């Protein structure tokens, strides 16, 4: 019987952790395309993300390469505004949201949570083509460090020195500025949500396990310690049972 590929991935990740090998999510800094080893760790690649395994993944890779040429930076040098202004318009919404959800942009240089990346992208993608063009042309000079500052300069009409075409659009941008500063929900990444998103897009949790997202205060032993021979009375472990198998 052919094994489910997602189950194979899950078992590989679980086994790696037992041998103290870190398994990490795909990220733009490393920009690896497929699953593999790098500096004693195992990394998922961009094309291991569900919905990006085929042609869609190739398109994302091409978009990142084009952005590198356009702004003369390596992927690991991108900041969040580079990603929003130059990269996001080159990628379809489904693919970009998948990248945000697995933490592809949540690196040290970009420094954005997964939820914040999703939230600001959904605001940014509603700009008109003319407004996006204005931001693209002005960003190299103004070098905004965040989306709020970019929208602050964009909001005035063209007659007022900004980038909007009319008063109605000015009001829309000002309204979005309010929600950038005052999001209606917490934009930090909840551990259970991270587990859920990685299972959805990578086939299994990678950054955290269901156990790590749970209360483990009553446990005194890990699964690894049991496998290494620990035994005795009053052993308590916290584990996630994914399947039962008879031997």
How would you name each of these model-derived features?
Residues 1-247:
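Noncatalytic, beta-rich nucleic-acid-contacting surfaces in large DNA/RNA-processing enzymes
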């Amino acid at each position: 019987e052919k094994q489910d590929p997602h189950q194979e991935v899950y078992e590989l990740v679980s086994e790696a952790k037992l041998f103290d090998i870190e398994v990490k999510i795909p990220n733009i800094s490393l920009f690896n395309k497929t699953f593999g080893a790098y500096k004693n760790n195992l990394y998922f690649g961009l094309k291991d993300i569900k919905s990006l395994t085929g042609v869609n993944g190739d398109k994302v890779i091409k978009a990142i390469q084009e952005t590198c040429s356009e702004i003369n930076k390596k992927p690991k040098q991108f900041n969040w505004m580079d990603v929003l202004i130059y990269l996001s318009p080159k990628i379809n919404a489904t693919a970009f949201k998948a990248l945000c959800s697995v933490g592809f942009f949540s690196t040290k240089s970009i420094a954005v949570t997964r939820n914040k990346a999703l939230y600001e992208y959904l605001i940014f993608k509603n700009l008109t083509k003319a407004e996006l063009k204005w931001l693209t042309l002005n960003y190299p000079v103004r070098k905004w460090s965040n989306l709020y500052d970019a929208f602050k300069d964009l909001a005035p009409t063209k007659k007022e020195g900004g980038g909007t075409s009319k008063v109605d659009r000015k009001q829309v941008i000002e309204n979005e500025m309010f929600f950038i500063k005052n999001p209606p929900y917490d934009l930090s990444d909840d551990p259970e949500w991270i587990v859920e998103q990685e299972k959805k897009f990578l086939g299994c949790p990678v950054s955290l396990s269901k156990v790590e997202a749970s209360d483990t205060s009553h446990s005194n032993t890990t699964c690894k310690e049991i496998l290494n021979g620990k035994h005795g009375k009053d052993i308590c472990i916290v584990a996630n049972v994914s399947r039962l198998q008879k031997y």
